[in-house]
Amino acid sequence: MLEIREGSNHDLILTGRFDASQVEKARGVFLSLNEGKTLDFSGLDYISSAGLGVLLAAQKRLSQRGHKLRLVNVNNHIRDVFRFSGFDQIFEIA
């Protein structure tokens, strides 16, 4: 299960597993963003291709408005997923 909550500095903290069963929940959050956000992945254990698709759609929508998503505290496994998919070229990963 995926939990998305706002942190103390207005970043979004993701916890759990971001898979196909959580896409509708996440889509509602990410596609409602009107400005760039930092996504804290420190509690994220897994992301599927469906999760990547939601993030890509949000990034595309935000970039058309001059904003972007920034990812922080990305574990090695998820960092590899972004690298192998080429998403490390699309997202700023700190």
Feature locations, PLM:
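Short beta-strand/loop segment at the start of cytosolic alpha/beta domains
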Residues: 1-13
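Glycine/Thr-rich beta-alpha phosphate-binding loop at enzyme active sites
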Residues: 15-19
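Short acidic-hydrophobic, aromatic-tinged amphipathic segments that line or gate anion-handling sites
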Residues: 92-94
